[in-house]
Amino acid sequence: MIKLASLIKEAKSDYEVYHKSYTSAIEAARAYAEKKGYEINNDDAFTKIGMGPRKPSEGKTNRFDIELSKDGKVQRKKLQIQVYGMKNSYELNAYIQ
């Protein structure tokens, strides 16, 4: 009999999905973008994340799109961040699009 686990091949993400704190989730998203070779526009990140909505309560999601640059040149792509508030932790979904 074939085990179900051997048939399922889920993609391994380049960042940790579950975090104990909201700050940890945001820092992981920033590290993900930097690992891919992009530089984050700190002014844009501060305005949207730091001055934006408070951390999500249970069952709510905060979404952000942050400007990126590569080799000093602003890119059309953006870092998409979604942080979902769970009971005692936060779920991170981040990608570059």
Placement of each model-derived feature along the sequence:
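Charge-dense, intrinsically disordered terminal/linker segments
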Residues: 1-97
